[in-house]
């Protein structure tokens, strides 16, 4: 098992998570005893204990006082915070994960975009006005796109959408920089922003879902053209 890590705790965490992912520690199984596991990984028991607590908080493990540590089925017990980890563990499946991420984001954003234009059209107009000074670079578009989503999610009347977006943030920012490196993708997005601005000015929230659906289809087609050339390094958490 080849693991790139910045220190003993990082190594131990990646070792255990990869072992769970590769079914060496399958869901429902009991982890080896602390002393045995610390010797196996090559870290102190204190370091291991801290790592186990962190993995339990993320849903990978179940720790109960006086009982052995049990491996969870992370698909049932973890949240969006493990998206980065899954991308790291499964680079071959990363393009599919991104497809699923973008699909989920498109579906959810249709709800909070509509909510924002309905409940806070002035805030929507304010953030959309920034498109007229937007630099034609991948970095600027990726940053603005996240800002737009974050602002409208917060203005939708349901701030829980912001927490969902936060779970996507690291992964989406890397994918976004790659996606918006295409001038066609930037133009497609700019046209969408302009149409959304017109709806905001007209306080027309009813037509938002149709606009989102059209942009979702068109940007999805654009993504399919780009994804096969996506650098594998984008899957890595430290990629910039």
Curated annotation (Swiss-Prot):
Indicate where this protein resides in the cell.
Cytoplasm
Please name the Pfam families in this protein's record: FadR_C (PF07840), GntR (PF00392)
Entry keywords, A to Z? Activator, Cytoplasm, DNA-binding, Fatty acid metabolism, Lipid metabolism, Repressor, Transcription, Transcription regulation
Secretion signal span: none
Q: Which residues form the HTH gntR-type domain?
A: 6-74
**MF terms (GO), sorted A to Z:** DNA binding; DNA-binding transcription factor activity; fatty-acyl-CoA binding
- Residue ranges forming the DNA-binding region read 34-53
GO terms in the biological process aspect are: fatty acid metabolic process; regulation of fatty acid metabolic process
Do you know which SUPFAM superfamilies this protein is assigned to? Answer: GntR ligand-binding domain-like, Winged helix' DNA-binding domain
- Main localisation: cytoplasm
Q: Do the record's keywords include Transcription? A: yes
Which GO CC annotations does the UniProt entry carry? cytoplasm
Protein purpose: Multifunctional regulator of fatty acid metabolism.
Oligomeric state and interaction partners are given as:
Homodimer.
Protein name as annotated? Fatty acid metabolism regulator protein
The protein's organism comes out as Shewanella oneidensis (strain ATCC 700550 / JCM 31522 / CIP 106686 / LMG 19005 / NCIMB 14063 / MR-1)
């Amino acid at each position: 098992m080849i693991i790139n890590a910045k220190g003993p705790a990082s190594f131990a965490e990646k070792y255990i998570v990869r072992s769970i992912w590769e079914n060496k520690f399958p869901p429902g199984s009991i982890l080896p005893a602390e002393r045995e596991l610390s010797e196996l990984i090559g870290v102190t028991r204190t370091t291991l204990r801290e790592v186990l607590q962190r993995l339990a908080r993320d849903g990978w493990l179940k720790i109960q006082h006086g009982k052995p540590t049990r491996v969870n089925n992370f698909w049932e017990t973890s949240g969006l915070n493990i998206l980065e980890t899954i991308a790291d563990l499964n680079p071959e499946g990363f393009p599919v994960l991104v497809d699923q991420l973008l699909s989920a984001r498109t579906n959810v954003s249709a709800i909070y975009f509509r909510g924002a234009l309905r409940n806070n059209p002035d805030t929507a107009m304010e953030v959309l006005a920034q498109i007229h000074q937007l630099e034609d670079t991948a970095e600027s578009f990726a940053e603005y796109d996240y800002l737009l989503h974050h602002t409208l999610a917060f203005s939708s009347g349901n701030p829980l959408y912001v927490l969902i977006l936060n779970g996507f943030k690291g992964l989406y920012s890397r994918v976004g920089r790659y996606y918006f490196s295409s001038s066609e993708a930037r133009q497609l997005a700019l046209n969408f922003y302009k149409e959304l601005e017109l709806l905001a000015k007209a306080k027309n929230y009813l037509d938002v879902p149709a606009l989102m659906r059209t942009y979702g289809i068109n940007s999805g087609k654009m993504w399919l053209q780009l994804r096969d050339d996506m650098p594998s390094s984008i899957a890595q958490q430290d990629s910039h």
